[in-house]
Structure formats: structure tokens, C-alpha cells
């Protein structure tokens, strides 16, 4: 019996006991299977949100890099990142990848510990190490190690036999493969892989149904298989205090770089590096060669003790996918023109030969023909411009600096200046058609022909240009101003408007002053008065020109107050960044001549007529309103009243020690303002003086009350009104005790019924009072125990009697 198992009260013995145990075991197994299936299903549904916390607690530099870059080879894209990878280990489905997953890590481990451990081994070094964390910042026990190449990852796995020992703990290593994306959908507009639950594109908001209908199958694979090429590479994992010189020193054995080829990104607040930098080379082929050299280095490139990751700097714009599987840059023809214009401006500024290498684009690829055509056109344009400049360099002494029309489409805030011929030079007149034909591909891909019917403008397709503040229409090459609703043609420098009836672009109304230049001045004045006051293209251009000049003048005054006089001319060659938008559209040749320093003799010869100024817009003929011409002429003459060499005000005959004092005198001095007013009026003709006085009267406040007082005099003040007094009406009320108390009252009758007789006192022995009790008034004191006074007051007393009694009581109290 010793071998028999003792059965408890809750356990059933006999033949039913084994059946129950078997049923319990089966139930536990089925429950575990259901739990596993539920876990897999929930993990599939939550795959996009499973590891969001690693992005929340990652470094801001790495977060910005992941947001701005797309990983096409391993399937990392901005909508999914590492959430697209399958973390469940299945040996049969495991495929080689350049990303390795480390599982079973200690909770206290950090990314730096993993990086130091991997750098201690010989062989290929990782490009990036990412530790997955929870929202609390605690490690989740696994991390991802990314290598530059697939061969590096496979050799690392073979060398370590898929096992590591970190902090005394055995770590398992597996290839991290992306999950199949058959349930995801690809946006047809921006080529972004979106989750299957999204009904609209995460980036551009395109409808899912349209993309599924238009995008052919197999497009995703074609996008992943095509490499990305550009002329800029990105350097990641840069130390916070690394400088540009350190980067140049590290890259000097492999490429010849200048300081302007490297851009180190820094934080605006801390002024420390944000962890990455950009290196721009002359062509995409040079960038590709440098990238291959840096990625093949063993050990990898290090700058200030940090292992640097190298890759192409991918643009924020995605690549479009054609049905045949080829990729075309998502930059429209407008963006191509912008790039070509920037190339032209930078070449003219640096003075080097304009050669652009488009060899990285394969012949036959879509877009190759356009880029080749733009390259040829702009090389020809640059050669013509440089040839004209060399021929005119010896003939012209004062060279003006203006911005070209190509700067209209500049995407960066930089100014691309080029020297041009002075107004009216033979070179300029001899080559108007050539410059127009060469600029046509850059500014407008199609051009606008007057009289040709076009489709109705679609403002949703316009692209905003930050440098000019206008919207660019890629179909017509025009710039749209939403405020005035005019279109600007950068080729002809003319304003247009859309005519819905004719379905074409019609030039804005231009003045006819050029046709009637030979008529007498009186007739011109009448025509100007009869001209309607509508805002034409000339007036719009004039307003923007005046606005740009005012901004430039303010900025030049501020800059010149801190600089010597000899650097003034060099400073004036630089355009103001605040007025870049106005000058990029409306500045033409000869704009700087108005701001050149003038000697005092020009003030004495100011009676001579000024030469006609060349308009900033080709369509502007100089025929503007009288007020605008008056203001402009006065402003040009006022600039001659200051000698900036001697620091003297010629109008007030005052000399100052520095430029700042002279500027303050012009802006704040009452004497200068009075003299300027007198000078302005002396320079005006009778008609202009009348117009100015009329304008001042309209702008001045008219005190009509003062005019009335001056005409009719001040009237006498009215007599003050007296207050009306109303006598209160007398009210008859009952006064039974006015004449004394008689025997007819109720109290007297009650006392007589009890045996009381008139004249006797109250009480059993008639010892009480014989007269009735009179009402008395007691004056209020200051508190308890204060001495007060009382005086008799009857209801029949008048106000005068009551006052007399109170006064008498006070008098007796004083005694």
C-alpha cells in the first residue's frame, strides 16, 4: 500500500480520473493555440503602430534623417520604417539582409554599448545601431544593426556564427527581412507606400481607389530596384562639435573639396551639429564614385572618433513611376527650368566655364532629351553673355549690377547677379533676339502665343515660388499674382490677364505715350488727365519698384553706418535680401546708376533735365500719373543734397563727423525738414505746386468748427437753467391729540368704568399720575453709557417747534 498514491478529496479516482486529466490537457493545448493565433492576428493588425515608441524616444537628429530619407533596398519608407519588418523568427523563411536583429539583450544596455562592442571586433563595421525602447525609455530587449552592404552583413553573421555575448549574456542574431507588402498600396502621385488601412495618401492626400486603378502591378518592385543618383551625399553620425575643416581633412584623400561644397547642419538654439552634413560635388558621377570609395573603406570613415555613415542625399520630392517601370524625376518642367536658371546664374557669378555633366542620365530614359536640350541652350547662353561682357569691359567704366530674369525662378534666397551692358549700348541692341531665344527654355517650357486658345487655368497645379512671392504655372510658364490676378511673362517681361470669352491670355493695357511723343506738352497733359485711374501693369510695376527701393535704402543706411566710406561702393553691389522678390521681377539694366555717389556740382546744375530713365519692366513706357512722377523726381533730386564723401548736408550747410550723424540729421532734424520743404516747393512748377497743395488740403484734417467760429464769431453762452421746485401737496390726516386729550377717548372710558374719576391719580389709593404720558425724543449717543438728552415732543408740533425744543435741550445740557 506504500506505493499507492493518496488521493485528495478534490481528485476523482477510478477510470474517470484519467479521462478528466486527458481532457484538461487537451483544453490547455487548444487554449494555447488560440492564444498564439490571437497574438499573430493582433500583431498583423498593429504592425504599423507596434514600434512607434522607438521613434518617440530616439534622437532628434536620427528622427529627422528617417523622416527625410527613404530606404528603398530594405523596404524602409517613411510611412512604415521598422514597423514593416517581421520580428518573429522563422528559420525556413529567413533571407539574407544587410540589417541584422539582435534579440535577448539586457534591459540596461544602450546603443553606445552595442556600438562599442561591435567596433571591438575585426571586420566590417555597422552603419547604424538602433535600440528599440518603450515609451518609458526602457529597452525592449532587441535592436537592429544595419551594415552598408549585404556582403558585410553576411560575413559578420558567418564570422560570429549568429551568436554574440554581451554583458555575459548570449544574444541571438537573425536577419531582419521586410514583410510582404501585398496588402499595401502605392500612391500614383508621390509613389509613397501607404498602409492598407489608409484611404488617402499619407503625403499628398491622393485617393486610394485612383492609385489602385492606375498603378500597374509590379511597380513597387521596379521602384525598389532602381538606384538613386544625385550630386550630393549625406554624412551621418557626425559629432556635435565637429567643424567643416575636420570634414575636409577627412575627405581630402578621396576628393578635392572647397568650403562651399560642404554644408554642416546645426541647431539654431544650441549652435551644435545636428548629426549630419551634406557634401555637394560637381556632378552625380563624382558623387557616385566618392560614395563607392567611402563605403568600401575598411575600417570605415571616422571623423573625430565617430564612425560616419555615407549615402546619397535623397530629395524630399519622390520619383514618379511610369507604366514601363522607369523612374522620372517628380520635378516638373518648371523645376527643370529653375535648376537651369540656377546653373546659369552661378556660372556667371563664378566666372568659370559652363559645363554640366548629364552623363548619369541614360540615353533613352524619359527626361534625357529635356536635360540635354537645356544643357546645350544654357551653355550657348552663357558663352554669349561672357563674350558680350568681355567686349564691353574695356569700353564701359561704370558697370552696373542687376539680377537676371533667371533669378525669378530661383528656389534659394541667394542672389545670382551678373554684369550686364549699360542701357542703350550697341551690344544690347544687337542681341535682343538671341537673349530671348536662349532664355525661353529656362523660363517657359511652352511659351504663350497671343491669340492662341488655352485651357482654363487650374490654380491647384500652380507652384509657389518663395523668391518672387508669385505662383508658377508649369503648363504656360507664367507667374501668377493672386493679389492683382495678373500673369507675368518672364520672357517678354509683360503682364497678362486671362480672357474667359476668348480663352487666351491678353496683354495688359499699355499707355500710348510712345506713339504721341512728338505732340505738344499741353496735349499730353490733357491726355493724362483724361486717362482713367485704373491699375495697369505699369502702375503695378511702379509700385513694386518703389517698395523695393525703399527697402534697399533702409538696409543700405543701416549697413553703411557700420562700414567705412571706401567700402560703400562694394556694398552697393549687393542686392538687399528683403527686396529680392521685387528686384528679381522688375530690376533691369541701369538700376544702380540712380544710387551712385554724385558730386556737389550736380546740385547747382539740377535745373537741367535728367536723362530719361530706362523702365524696370520692358512694358513700362514711363507714362504714369502726375503724382507718381512728381514723387519720383523729388526723391531723385533729394539724393543729390548730401555729400557722402565729405559727410555734409548741402541743403543745410552742415558737416558731420560720420555717416550715422548725417543720416540722423536727415531723418530727425527740424531744420533739415524745413529746408527740404522750401527746396521742394522751389523746384515745382505752378501746376505741380497747385497739385501738391491740393493733395495736402485733401490729406489735412479740416476743422469745420474753427471755420464757423472764424466766420460767425463765438456766440454768447446760454443762461444756466434753474432747477424747478415742486411744492409737496398737503395731506389731511387725523390728529386726535392736537387740541389735547378729552374724556371721549377709549382709555378714559375704560378707567371711568373701573371707578376712576377725572383729576384723581391712578392706583388703588389714587397715588399715581394724573396727566397722560407725553412722547419724548432721546438724542442718540456715542455708545453704551454715553450721556444723552431728552426733550418732550408731541405729534402736533411742527418742524420748527421740534427744532426749538431740541436746541433748548442742548442749551440746558451745556449749563
From Swiss-Prot:
Ranges annotated as biased composition (Polar residues): 411-422, 510-519
The name this protein goes by in its record: RNA-binding protein 5
UniProt source species: Rattus norvegicus
InterPro entries (UniProt xref): G_patch_dom (IPR000467), Nucleotide-bd_a/b_plait_sf (IPR012677), OCRE (IPR041591), RBD_domain_sf (IPR035979), RBM5_RRM1 (IPR034991), RBM5_RRM2 (IPR034993), RRM_dom (IPR000504), Znf_C2H2_type (IPR013087)
GO molecular function terms listed in the Swiss-Prot or TrEMBL record: mRNA binding; RNA binding; zinc ion binding
CDD domains given in the database record: OCRE_RBM5, RRM1_RBM5, RRM2_RBM5
Record key words, sorted: Apoptosis, Metal-binding, mRNA processing, mRNA splicing, Nucleus, Phosphoprotein, Repeat, RNA-binding, Spliceosome, Zinc, Zinc-finger
One Pfam assignment: RRM_1
Ranges annotated as biased composition (Low complexity): 426-446
Positions carrying Phosphoserine: 18, 59, 69, 72, 78, 444, 621, 624
Summary of subunit composition and partner proteins: Component of the spliceosome A complex (also known as the prespliceosome). Appears to dissociate from the spliceosome upon formation of the spliceosome B complex (also known as the precatalytic spliceosome), in which the heterotrimeric U4/U6.U5 snRNPs are bound. Interacts with U2AF2; this interaction is direct. Also interacts with ACIN1, PRPF8, SFRS3, SNRPB, SNRPN, SNRNP70 and SNRNP200; these interactions may be indirect.
Function in brief: Component of the spliceosome A complex. Binds to ssRNA containing the consensus sequence 5'-AGGUAA-3'. Regulates alternative splicing of a number of mRNAs. May modulate splice site pairing after recruitment of the U1 and U2 snRNPs to the 5' and 3' splice sites of the intron. May both positively and negatively regulate apoptosis by regulating the alternative splicing of several genes involved in this process, including FAS and CASP2/caspase-2. In the case of FAS, promotes production of a soluble form of FAS that inhibits apoptosis.
Region named Required for interaction with U2AF2: 321-809
SMART domains: G_patch, RRM, ZnF_RBZ
Amino acid at each position: 500500500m506504500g506505493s499507492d498514491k493518496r488521493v485528495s478529496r478534490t481528485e476523482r479516482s477510478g477510470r474517470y480520473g484519467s479521462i478528466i486529466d486527458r481532457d484538461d490537457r487537451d483544453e490547455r493545448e487548444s487554449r494555447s493555440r488560440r492564444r498564439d493565433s490571437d497574438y499573430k492576428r493582433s500583431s498583423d493588425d498593429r504592425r504599423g503602430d507596434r514600434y512607434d515608441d522607438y521613434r518617440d524616444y530616439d534622437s532628434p537628429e536620427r528622427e529627422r534623417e528617417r523622416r527625410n530619407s527613404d530606404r528603398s533596398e530594405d523596404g524602409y519608407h517613411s510611412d512604415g520604417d521598422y514597423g514593416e519588418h517581421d520580428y518573429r523568427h522563422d528559420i525556413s523563411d529567413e533571407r539574407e539582409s544587410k540589417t541584422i536583429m539582435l534579440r535577448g539583450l539586457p534591459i540596461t544596455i544602450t546603443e553606445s554599448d552595442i556600438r562599442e562592442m561591435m567596433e571591438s571586433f575585426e571586420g566590417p563595421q555597422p552603419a547604424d545601431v538602433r535600440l528599440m525602447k518603450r515609451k518609458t525609455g526602457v529597452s525592449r530587449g532587441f535592436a537592429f544593426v544595419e551594415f552598408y552592404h549585404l556582403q558585410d552583413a553576411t560575413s559578420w553573421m558567418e564570422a560570429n556564427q549568429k551568436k554574440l555575448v554581451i554583458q555575459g549574456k548570449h544574444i541571438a542574431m537573425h536577419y531582419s527581412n521586410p514583410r510582404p507588402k501585398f496588402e499595401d498600396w502605392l500612391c500614383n502621385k508621390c509613389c509613397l507606400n501607404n498602409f492598407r488601412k489608409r484611404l488617402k495618401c499619407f503625403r499628398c492626400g491622393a485617393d486610394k481607389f485612383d492609385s489602385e486603378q492606375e498603378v500597374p502591378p509590379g511597380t513597387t518592385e521596379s521602384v525598389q530596384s532602381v538606384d538613386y543618383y544625385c550630386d550630393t551625399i549625406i554624412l551621418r553620425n557626425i559629432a556635435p562639435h565637429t567643424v567643416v575643416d575636420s570634414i575636409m581633412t577627412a575627405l581630402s584623400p578621396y576628393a578635392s573639396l572647397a568650403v562651399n561644397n560642404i554644408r554642416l547642419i546645426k541647431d539654431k538654439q544650441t549652435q551644435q551639429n545636428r548629426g549630419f552634413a551634406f557634401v555637394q560635388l560637381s556632378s552625380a558621377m563624382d558623387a557616385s564614385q566618392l560614395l563607392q570609395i567611402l563605403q568600401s573603406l575598411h575600417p570605415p570613415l571616422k571623423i573625430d572618433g565617430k564612425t560616419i555613415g555615407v549615402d546619397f542625399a535623397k530629395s524630399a520630392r519622390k520619383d514618379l513611376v511610369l507604366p514601363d517601370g522607369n523612374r522620372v524625376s517628380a520635378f516638373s518642367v518648371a523645376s527643370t527650368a529653375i535648376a537651369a536658371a540656377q546653373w546659369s546664374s552661378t556660372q556667371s557669378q563664378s566666372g568659370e566655364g559652363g559645363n554640366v555633366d548629364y552623363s548619369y542620365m541614360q540615353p533613352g530614359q524619359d527626361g534625357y532629351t529635356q536635360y540635354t536640350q537645356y544643357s546645350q541652350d544654357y551653355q550657348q547662353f552663357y558663352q554669349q553673355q561672357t563674350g558680350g561682357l568681355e567686349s564691353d569691359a574695356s569700353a564701359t567704366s561704370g558697370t552696373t549690377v542687376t539680377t537676371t530674369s533667371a533669378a525669378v525662378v530661383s528656389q534659394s534666397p541667394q542672389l545670382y547677379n551678373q554684369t550686364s551692358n549699360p542701357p542703350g549700348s550697341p551690344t544690347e541692341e544687337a542681341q535682343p533676339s538671341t537673349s530671348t531665344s536662349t532664355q525661353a527654355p529656362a523660363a517657359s517650357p511652352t511659351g504663350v502665343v497671343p491669340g492662341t486658345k488655352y485651357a482654363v487655368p487650374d490654380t491647384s497645379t500652380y507652384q509657389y515660388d518663395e523668391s518672387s512671392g508669385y505662383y508658377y504655372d508649369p503648363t504656360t510658364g507664367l507667374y501668377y499674382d493672386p493679389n492683382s490676378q495678373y500673369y507675368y511673362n518672364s520672357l517678354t517681361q509683360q503682364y497678362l490677364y486671362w480672357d474667359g470669352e476668348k480663352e487666351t491670355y491678353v496683354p495688359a493695357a499699355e499707355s500710348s505715350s510712345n506713339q504721341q511723343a512728338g505732340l505738344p506738352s499741353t496735349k499730353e497733359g490733357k491726355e493724362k488727365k483724361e486717362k482713367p485711374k485704373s491699375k495697369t501693369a505699369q502702375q503695378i510695376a511702379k509700385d513694386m519698384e518703389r517698395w523695393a527701393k525703399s527697402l534697399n535704402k533702409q538696409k543700405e543706411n543701416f549697413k553703411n553706418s557700420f562700414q567705412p566710406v571706401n567700402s560703400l561702393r562694394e556694398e552697393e553691389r549687393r542686392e538687399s535680401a528683403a527686396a529680392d522678390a521685387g528686384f528679381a521681377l522688375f530690376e533691369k539694366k541701369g538700376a544702380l546708376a540712380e544710387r551712385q555717389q554724385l558730386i556737389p556740382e550736380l546740385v547747382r546744375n539740377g535745373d537741367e533735365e535728367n536723362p530719361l530713365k530706362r523702365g524696370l519692366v520692358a512694358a513700362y513706357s514711363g507714362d504714369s500719373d502726375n503724382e507718381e512722377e512728381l514723387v519720383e523726381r523729388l526723391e531723385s533730386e533729394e539724393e543729390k543734397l548730401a555729400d557722402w564723401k565729405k559727410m555734409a548736408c548741402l541743403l543745410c550747410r552742415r558737416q558731420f563727423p560720420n555717416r550715422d550723424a548725417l543720416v540722423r540729421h536727415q531723418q530727425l532734424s527740424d531744420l533739415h525738414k524745413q529746408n527740404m520743404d522750401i527746396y521742394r516747393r522751389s523746384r515745382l512748377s505752378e501746376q505741380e505746386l497747385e497739385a501738391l497743395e491740393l493733395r495736402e488740403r485733401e490729406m489735412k484734417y479740416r476743422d469745420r468748427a474753427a471755420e464757423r467760429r472764424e466766420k460767425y464769431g463765438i456766440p454768447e453762452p446760454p443762461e444756466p437753467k434753474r432747477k424747478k421746485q415742486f411744492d409737496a401737496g398737503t395731506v389731511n390726516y387725523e390728529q386726535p391729540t392736537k387740541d389735547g386729550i378729552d374724556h371721549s377717548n377709549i382709555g378714559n372710558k375704560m378707567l371711568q368704568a373701573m371707578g376712576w374719576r377725572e383729576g384723581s391719580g391712578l392706583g388703588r389709593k389714587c397715588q399715581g399720575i394724573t396727566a397722560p404720558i407725553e412722547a419724548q425724543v432721546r438724542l442718540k449717543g456715542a455708545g453704551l453709557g454715553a450721556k444723552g438728552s431728552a426733550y418732550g415732543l408731541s405729534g402736533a408740533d411742527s418742524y420748527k417747534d421740534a427744532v426749538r425744543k431740541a436746541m433748548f435741550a442742548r442749551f440746558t445740557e451745556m449749563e
